[in-house]
C-alpha cells in the first residue's frame, strides 16, 4: 500500500515521517526528492501548457510530427533534446539567451551539424501566443538590441533547469546555492541518518 509523505523531521534519535495514512518512526531515511522543471514565467506559458508548451521531449515529442518546434535553454538537456526532437519536427529552433552554451562541446557540435536545427542565440522568449486552443507562435527578443520578432511554431519545450523538490524536510539540512541538498560520497547529509539519492 502506498502512502504520500507530507513531512520528514528529526525527533530525538529517530525520524518522524508524517504521511496521509498516519505517522511513522524510523532510524534512517533515504530521501529521493527529484526536481520540478523550471518555468519561464511568461505570458501564455501556463495557458498553453499541454497545448504546445511542454517540459518533456520524450513524453510529448511525438505529438509534433512534421511541425515546427522550439526549444529554450543552453545546457545539456536543451541541446540533447533539440537533437532528439528532430526525429519528429520538420524544423527545430533552439533559443538561448547567451552566445555560448553550457552544454558539452560534443553535444553542441552534433547540434550545429544537424540540418533540421536552427540556433538562435542572444534571445529570450517573451510570450507564448495561441488561438485559445493551442500554441501558434512565440514572441522572442534579442537581449542585446531589444529587437522583437515573432516565430511561428506549434511546440515549445522548456529546458532551463530544475527547482529542487526539498520541501518535505523540515530540519535545517545543508543546501547548495541552487537549493539542492548537499551530500558526501556516501549520500549522507549533515543530519545523521538522512540520506539523499
Annotate each language-model stretch with its function.
Residues 78:
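N-terminal Rossmann-fold NAD(P) dinucleotide-binding loop
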Residues 41, 46-63, 159-197:
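FAD-site-proximal beta/loop scaffold in flavoenzymes
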Residues 82-83:
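Generic hydrophobic/aromatic pocket-lining and core-packing "Φ" positions
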Residues 31-32, 71, 158:
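Redox-cofactor binding/interface segments in oxidoreductases and associated redox assembly factors
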Residues 73-75:
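Glycine-rich Rossmann-fold phosphate-binding loop(s) that bind the pyrophosphate
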Residues 27-28, 51, 66-69:
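Nucleotide donor/acceptor-binding cores
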Residues 3-18, 23-26, 87-185:
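A Rossmann-like FAD-binding core segment of flavoenzymes
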